[in-house]
Amino acid sequence: MDIEKAPHSFRRSFNLAMLTVAILGANALAMAQESSQLKLRDILGKGARQLSADEVQQLLPEAKVMSVGARGVTRRWRNNADGKFVASGYDPTTTTPRMQNFQGQGSWHIGDNGKYCVMLEWPRTTEQWCRILFKLDDKYYAVKSADDENAVVHELEIRH
């Protein structure tokens, strides 16, 4: 059937149906991504342990850090001893080639109770957070609160 030759009311209904399918598909994907995110209880159940403030102090200076977000955005930096760093990022979801690769200036410090604190000034936004670090096998995870077992954890690759 040639949609261009169909009556206007049919084309409008068809377009609305296609839009509805697209919205429902996007919502289902977003819900699946959210429900598939690791929670603190998941890693604790596998034996993860919270790093002490001393362990964090030994781990972070001069460490190379990489994180991959839920949408596949990759960010990398190296924690310089002076508390500053230059970060680079790659966003595979953008359709603007010049925005796929980006850089930002940042700083880091170890906060209260050994929390890893980062401030990043990206070209379009500023990101600031403090996270508690956990270790499971050879992987590190960052979480906002160790008291909330439903808190989403973010895997960080930390190496020297």
Model segments located where?
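N-terminal secretory signal peptides and thylakoid transit peptides that target proteins
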Residues: 8-16
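Bacterial N-terminal signal peptides
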Residues: 15-26
